[in-house]
């Protein structure tokens, strides 16, 4: 179905809905993006007047008004009608055209005697890849002709190390003012290499540029003195034009800067991979809040940092934080009496806390020992009364001197001069067996204070009680010599 010229001057949506037949709404303008693909399909086709037909001839529809009709493009040859030059029709093609046209670049200064071939292969580089225009592809090929490949070893220029893809990126940026990342260049190289290898596998004919490109990708430029001098002359000039180069070889973009005096972070460089607007906004807000807030103490600064991080929450403590200014700690004035009194109070409170902690530790130690006695199967019911004395071990104070420790009595549990193991000691009563040891004067002197008084009253006052004690059974000198209690 044909469209009238007046339809483009009115509401298009309303007029298109009124049609019930087939509508051709796709037009191809010469030199457009899609035209490059069609020219590659028909490189030698010549558009004639017969290639364009009227709408009446295709749809076989008699129109009432015979105004000049739009010509539909036939067989995809890219013919353009003069009627498409109207402002209403031309507006539909402006969005599809490339907005940034790359200026024409002459490479005769660097490659004398070489002229760019205008073959179908050059035109096919732009097919399906809007980011790699013809100018960028030419700069890409020029960079490959300059850079010599040396395995994985980087090239040192101006005290900085650069890889091949990074140098290609710099050259493209310098020549076309369009930036390509190292990852984009690496992918582009792999695509070209795979495409050419597939052509070789299918026994297809390669053009001269494809052969040259495959050789440059695999082997790089020829390593001659002339090529080396040309390489360093060009890339030293490119690197000198850059703002700065760090020691690691990473470049500082021209338009990327962090202003401490400004209100935030400005990121406008085309040398960087574009970041999302949300991340950029977070960075700017963080810089603004960080510059605005002047933390008086490290605690306030840490609180400010954690409050701005997702997943963290600052809960106010019960004790108020002392607002100390950092200048107070660095004053050269002598400390007054108030500062000494504060230090003295702090030391006293620390001692009290230490005493309380020792009491708590001793309490839980006694509880754990009592529980161990109860769970010990060797511990009989007849000796339960003695476990109380065993659990009440004397706690050596931390402030005890060496002389006090040396003057402490020797333990009364003897095993040929060696103390018994802990499991055996805790399973036995406090008083020794056999009872004849109680009459030994040296033994009484070796007991602690509270045990000495206990045995003085209990054993020495009524020795007849132990004359016929059942513990005297099976008492032999051998048992006495070994110090066994049973």
From Swiss-Prot:
Its main location: nucleus. This is Ty transcription activator TEC1. InterPro entries: TEA/ATTS_dom, TEA/ATTS_sf, TEC1_TEAD_TF. Residues 472-486 have a biased composition (Polar residues). The modification N-acetylserine is found at residue 2. It is found in: Nucleus. The gene is TEC1. Keywords: Acetylation, Activator, DNA-binding, Nucleus, Phosphoprotein, Transcription, Transcription regulation. One of its GO terms (cellular component) is transcription regulator complex. It comes from Saccharomyces cerevisiae (strain ATCC 204508 / S288c). One of its GO terms (molecular function) is sequence-specific DNA binding. Residues 125-199 bind DNA. TEC1 is involved in the activation of TY1 and TY1-mediated gene expression. It is not involved in mating or sporulation processes. Residues 377-388 have a biased composition (Low complexity). Belongs to the TEC1 family. One of its GO terms (biological process) is positive regulation of DNA-templated transcription. Residues 372-410, 465-486 are annotated as: Disordered. The modification Phosphoserine is found at residue 325. Gene3D superfamilies: TEA/ATTS domain (6.10.20.40). Present with 530 molecules/cell in log phase SD medium.
